[in-house]
Design a protein with these regions (language model features):
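Sec/Tat signal peptide C-region and signal peptidase I cleavage site
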Residues: 23-29
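Surface-exposed, polar/charged faces of alpha-helical domains
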Residues: 37, 52-55, 59, 92-96, ...
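Bacterial N-terminal signal peptides
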Residues: 13-22
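Non-transmembrane domains of secretory- and envelope-associated proteins
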Residues: 185-223
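Bacterial N-terminal signal peptides that target proteins for export
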Residues: 2-14
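Short beta-strand edge/turn micro-motifs at domain boundaries
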Residues: 161-190
Length: 223
C-alpha cells in the first residue's frame, strides 16, 4: 500500500492531534462545553499523565497507545470519519466490513500518531504542549452544530507558524466530536480517501481491510 506521500503529512497531523487536544482547562458555567473547551480540556489530563514520566515512546510504546486510547480517541468519531473517507464505497461495504474498517482505521491513526512521537520523551511532549501551541478564540452562534477550532503551532527555529484546524460537530448526545483535521488546508480525511480509493479499485473493500490489518499487525511488532 502506497502511504509514503500521505504519511509524511499525516505524521504532522498525528503529532498535532495528539498534542493539541488539551493545554489546560478553561472552566465555563455552561451545560455543554464549548468546542474550544473540549480542545483545551483533554490534554490537561494528558499533561498530568506525562508530567512524572521519564520514558520515551520507544521505551514503552504501549503506555502511549493506552494513553491515546483513553484520553484522545473518545473525542473523535471514527465511524463518521470512516464514512467520509470511504465515501461512495461505504454503502457498498457489508455491516461486518464497516465495523472492521472502522476498527482498523482507528488503529492505523492511533499508531501513526504514536509512531510520529517515537523518539520523543514524555518531557519533550509536555514542553511542546506548553510552549508551542496556541488555541485561538472561537466565535460561533449558540445554535451552531459545526465549529472549526483554529490552532497555531509555533514554527521551529524562527520558521513560519503552522495553521491547523480541528473540525468538530455536535452529536445527538450534545457532545462535541472531531471528524477531521486540517493542516495548512490539507484534510486528513481527503488525503486518506485518495489513497484508499486506489486500494479499493485494485482489490475491493475487503482487499483494503486486509491490507490495513496486515499493516497494523506489523506495526504492533515494531518496538
Amino acid at each position: 500500500m502506497d502511504y509514503n506521500r500521505v504519511t509524511k503529512r499525516l505524521l504532522v497531523m498525528g503529532v498535532m492531534a495528539l498534542t493539541i487536544l488539551g493545554l489546560g482547562v478553561i472552566a465555563q458555567a455552561t451545560t455543554i462545553p464549548s468546542p474550544r473547551d473540549v480542545v483545551l480540556d483533554t490534554s490537561q489530563r494528558v499533561l498530568e499523565a506525562l508530567k512524572n514520566q521519564q520514558i520515551t515512546v520507544a521505551d514503552d510504546p504501549e503506555y502511549f497507545y493506552g494513553l491515546a486510547d483513553e484520553l484522545i480517541v473518545p473525542h473523535f468519531n471514527f465511524r463518521r470519519m470512516s464514512q467520509r473517507v470511504l465515501g461512495k464505497y461505504w454503502r457498498q461495504a457489508t455491516d461486518e466490513q464497516q465495523v472492521d474498517f472502522v476498527n482498523q482505521f482507528r488503529q492505523l491513526l492511533v499508531r501513526t500518531y504514536v509512531t510520529a512521537l517515537y523518539k520523543y520523551s514524555a518531557k519533550d511532549i509536555t514542553n511542546f504542549l506548553q510552549e508551542r501551541i496556541k488555541v485561538l478564540p472561537t466565535n460561533y452562534p449558540p445554535e451552531a452544530t459545526r465549529v472549526n477550532v483554529k490552532v497555531l503551532v509555533e514554527g521551529q527555529n524562527g520558521g513560519p507558524p503552522i495553521n491547523m484546524i480541528l473540525n468538530l460537530y455536535l452529536n445527538k448526545e450534545k457532545t462535541w466530536k472531531v471528524d477531521d483535521i486540517q493542516v495548512e488546508g490539507v484534510s486528513l480525511v481527503t488525503n486518506y480517501r485518495a489513497t484508499f480509493y486506489r486500494e479499493i479499485r485494485a482489490g475491493g473493500i475487503q482487499g483494503l481491510i486486509d491490507k490495513l490489518v496486515s499493516r497494523n499487525q506489523h506495526a504492533m511488532t515494531m518496538k
